[in-house]
């Protein structure tokens, strides 16, 4: 049910620097809201890899099976990528698991609308519905398989991630495509800037998902990155990519406090 997007290119992960420092302030999340949930992929969540956020292999990126594709109303044209939610199945004792356990997930994909079907009969992700298409293991953690679709209550929560924000630099000489992953706190990045050792701070434009681009010539310079999330907080990671950085490498910077 969720859209699949082929990742831009395979990357070689090189951890050049890891900063354990945290940014002052804490993202507090949001109120409980009613929605619905379905599932996609297989029992091992292999069908959820890739996706419209550009994260690629969700296992190697640290997201695992705790993921979901969001409907148009929640996806925000990709700006919601990386945001974290708590969900629980409600008001359906025949299909919800006993005790109404909750799950914690990260938004990694887009659940496209299906206007050939009514929004209450197959077009679950049609706007203005707020809907979560969960990785199968997550759905089975709150409801029975045969339910197919269940009512849920959800809320935004702070993202808890291990290590720093990761910056994977893809592209070529005059096209830098930076994938931003593993963001704690609010999780959803709304602005990315880069500074070479010979440049001022340069704002990147969002290409798709959480891939951000710059056409500046940055090869041969050490790089610093600044990330701003939807709660208004910023994280600056200075000189995390050395002057001999290569395309396809990943560098780890300063994360947000949780």
Curated annotation (Swiss-Prot):
Q: Give the signal sequence positions.
A: 1-21
Which Pfam families does the record match to this protein?
Answer: DPBB_1 (PF03330), Expansin_C (PF01357)
UniProt keywords, alphabetically = Cell wall, Cell wall biogenesis/degradation, Disulfide bond, Membrane, Secreted, Signal
Please name every pair of cysteines joined by a disulfide bond in this record: 53-81, 84-159, 89-96
Compartments reported by the entry: Secreted, Cell wall; Membrane
Source organism superkingdom: Eukaryota
Q: Cellular component per GO?
A: extracellular region; membrane
Q: Which PROSITE patterns match?
A: EXPANSIN_CBD, EXPANSIN_EG45
User: Record's Gene3D superfamilies?
Assistant: Expansin, cellulose-binding-like domain, RlpA-like domain
Q: Decide whether keyword Membrane is in the record.
A: yes
Q: Which residues form the Expansin-like EG45 domain?
A: 50-164
What is the recorded membrane topology of this protein?
A: Peripheral membrane protein
Q: Name one GO biological process term.
A: plant-type cell wall loosening
Tagged with keyword DNA-binding: no
CDD domains recorded: DPBB_EXPA_N
Q: Specify the Expansin-like CBD domain's residue ranges.
A: 174-253
Q: Which function does this protein serve?
A: Causes loosening and extension of plant cell walls by disrupting non-covalent bonding between cellulose microfibrils and matrix glucans. No enzymatic activity has been found.
Name the family the entry cites.
Belongs to the expansin family. Expansin A subfamily.
What is the name listed in the Swiss-Prot or TrEMBL entry for this protein? Expansin-A9
Q: Which organism is it from?
A: Arabidopsis thaliana
